[in-house]
Amino acid sequence: NNIFKAVNQFEIEGVNNQLRIPDGIVFVNGIPVVVLEFKSAVQENTTIMDAYKQLTIRYRRDIPEIFKYNAFVVISDGANNKYGSFFSPYDFFYAWRKINSDDKELDGINSLVTMIKGLFRKDRLLEVIKDFIYFPDNSDKDLKIVCRYPQFFAANKLYENIKAHLRPEGDGKGGTYFGATGCGKSYTMLFLTRMLMKSKYFSSPTILIITDRTDLDDQLSKQFVGSKKYIGDETVVSIESRE
């Protein structure tokens, strides 16, 4: 069994004997996988941006070892609650607004509850770490993509639907997913592809992606061909024509 511990005010001696005390750290089997930094919403001189800077600048400089196995970080001022990759710009930190896929989206102080119950549920946290954190095979910069909650729920729902309708028992219709512009559809497809390829239920499936736009074709082919390690298959190819 995995051992989960959430520790607050954990003292860490870092570079040049600097003592740093993150507000919260989540450990799984003794490994620090999430670091949390909180600011108070009632103090006008501190904001959630200060929490972001403290994590990604000060702690990154002074206690880099704590982030060696980091999955993601959390910043909060009580009213605004966001998570994201340690390497991401602030604009790419997002709230986790649902506990379950069919729930109503919540914001503000309620989003702290949805994050704790929705993202930090033990089985779900492990699921996010296993399948929903993406590294490209090669990159000239630090890049790590952590799923947003709509991507997590969509990929899981698609996976279960494909499984339920698999032939010969099923009708072979895995379902239709509609994603609005800017929702991160390409990453949803990437997360789903990894789930299918890594699943013990499916036996080395062949996954075919068809696009109807040249720009999307270029984007997806580059992304998938550059994600062989993440997907778990070396035979990822881009086909120019069906001829």
Stretches with model-predicted labels:
Residues 225-243:
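Inter-Walker segment of RecA-like/P-loop motor cores
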Residues 1-211, 215-231:
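ATP-dependent helicase/translocase motor core
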